[in-house]
UniProtKB/Swiss-Prot annotation:
The keyword Secreted does not apply. The influenza A genome consist of 8 RNA segments. Genetic variation of hemagglutinin and/or neuraminidase genes results in the emergence of new influenza strains. The mechanism of variation can be the result of point mutations or the result of genetic reassortment between segments of two different strains. This is Neuraminidase. N-glycosylated. It comes from Influenza A virus (strain A/Swine/Colorado/1/1977 H3N2). Keywords: Calcium, Disulfide bond, Glycoprotein, Glycosidase, Host cell membrane, Host membrane, Hydrolase, Membrane, Metal-binding, Signal-anchor, Transmembrane, Transmembrane helix, Virion. Inhibited by the neuraminidase inhibitors zanamivir (Relenza) and oseltamivir (Tamiflu). These drugs interfere with the release of progeny virus from infected cells and are effective against all influenza strains. Resistance to neuraminidase inhibitors is quite rare. GO terms for cellular component: host cell plasma membrane; membrane; virion membrane. It is found in: Virion membrane; Host apical cell membrane.
Length: 469
């Protein structure tokens, strides 16, 4: 090959390489521009309906990094379409309950600024669980904590933190309340907050951080609600509220709420004689609640709520191993599904249970007379067979030498089923522990498991002798 041919060959190869590089740069530029403007090609609702843009429910700030030679491309992911929760999955099959969370609020109060609370509960949005409680407007190591045994003051507020985070000074005060309920409909939080005079209280309905509706006392005798989570199905939330005597006939209503607005109110119907402090859970297509009869029965009332036609039915848990405190011993206690058992029915404590086919899972204090200890178990036939007493899978949550308190249910939606969880309020201070002047609580939380589990006891654990007075 002569010198001229070599020059021509080298020039041709160089030109070819230059052309290929030029085309690659054009391809990279086109790819970059295409990915950059891809965010405008998301599928939005056809009727020009605005998409909510709140950080709780919209994931707009996720980036994917793609490397092409030396070019970095950022692609914004389209926002997820937010939908109402419908709770249509089946209930998880469980063998018992496993430990989930404990906040140790009282122990931490010995050396830190922790709120004085009572009436705690837990509820979850689609991505995270939160703990709630009614604060007393003071921390424990504060003279304002004196005499906080009282339930209803204008200083009480609903507190909200991520589950497992004690109520420290930076805790959000959601609303003014001495009785409350909260739930997430899939788009935003609903809070039902009761406060005011005993004879003329107000319930405020706060949705997505805004006050949307309210209702005043209808029987002028301590309007009150669940002290645990409400339930929302396809955008309709239900909450059970009672106004009237705590030891006689009262007026219970079930309110149906859509995005904070009361759309319907149904009176209690069925055979339940007295209903307070219901622990409710989704039982698609409706809602089921296990409540407290503070008048006639130590067996717990059941309230079934039809979300579609607003109809209500009520009865009692069939299990002869009853769930309230005080109660008869297990040999002499009874329940026949339809009526209160008239066994130590006066007084009581908030509690929970849930159906599992014909059986029932339930929790209760170990003591028959006081809020001490806590146990869970399953009663075979306890949902369908009158006075059934065959107990299996018993677990001790708090040993009988330690105090407990209120307890309630909350539901968590998994990939294939809905799990049931519960919390136990661990009360400390007055009236029983008179060395101190305050009354407050911590909580322990368990969730259903299909696996195996061991044994233990999870009391509050604070040494009252080293606590602030």
């Amino acid at each position: 090959m002569n010198p001229n041919q070599k020059i021509i060959t080298i020039g041709s190869v160089s030109l070819t390489i230059a052309t290929i590089c030029f085309l690659m740069q054009i391809a990279i530029l086109v790819t970059t521009v295409t990915l950059h403007f891809k965010q405008y090609e998301c599928d939005y609702p056809a009727n020009n309906q605005a998409m909510p843009c709140e950080p709780i429910i919209i994931e707009r700030n996720i980036t994917e990094i793609v490397y092409l030679t030396n070019t970095t491309i950022e692609k914004e992911v389209c926002p997820k379409l937010v939908e109402y929760r419908n709770w249509s999955k089946p209930q998880c099959k469980i063998t018992g309950f496993a430990p989930f969370s404990k906040d140790n609020s009282i122990r931490l109060s010995a050396g830190g600024d922790i709120w004085v609370t009572r009436e705690p509960y837990v509820s979850c949005d689609p991505g995270k669980c939160y703990q709630f409680a009614l604060g007393q407007g003071t921390t424990l190591d504060n003279k304002h904590s004196n005499d906080t045994i009282h339930d209803r003051t204008p200083h009480r507020t609903l507190l909200m933190n991520e589950l497992g985070v004690p109520f420290h000074l930076g805790t959000r005060q959601v609303c003014i309340a001495w009785s409350s309920s909260s739930c997430h409909d899939g788009k935003a939080w609903l809070h039902v907050c009761v406060t005011g005079y005993d004879k003329n209280a107000t319930a405020s309905f706060i949705y997505d951080g805004r006050l949307v509706d309210s209702i005043g006392s209808w029987s002028q005798n301590i309007l009150r609600t669940q002290e645990s989570e409400c339930v929302c199905i396809n955008g309709t939330c239900t909450v059970v509220m009672t106004d009237g005597s705590a030891s006689g006939r009262a007026d219970t209503k079930i309110l149906f709420i859509e995005e904070g607005k009361i759309v319907h109110t149904s009176p209690l119907s069925g055979s339940a004689q007295h209903v307070e402090e219901c622990s409710c859970y989704p039982r698609y297509p409706g809602v089921r609640c296990i409540c407290r009869d503070n008048w006639k029965g130590s067996n717990r009332p059941v309230v079934d709520i039809n979300v579609k036609d607003y109809s209500i039915n009520s009865s009692y848990v069939c299990s002869g191993l009853v769930g309230d405190t005080p109660r008869n011993n297990d040999r002499s206690s009874s329940s026949y599904c339809q009526n209160p058992n008239n066994e130590k029915g006066t007084h009581g404590v908030k509690g929970w249970a849930f159906d599992d086919g014909n059986d029932v899972w339930m929790g209760r204090t170990i003591s028959e007379d006081s809020r001490s200890g806590y146990e869970t178990f399953k009663v075979i036939g306890g949902w369908s067979t009158p006075n059934s007493k065959l107990q299996i899978n018993r677990q001790v949550i708090v040993d009988s030498d330690n105090r407990s308190g209120y307890s309630g249910i909350f539901s968590v939606e998994g990939k294939s089923c809905i799990n049931r969880c519960f919390y136990v309020e661990l009360i400390r201070g007055r009236e029983q522990e008179t060395r101190v002047w305050w009354t407050s609580n911590s909580i322990v939380v368990f969730c259903g498991t299909s696996g195996t589990y061991g044994t233990g006891s999870w009391p509050d654990g604070a040494d009252i002798n080293i606590m602030p007075i």
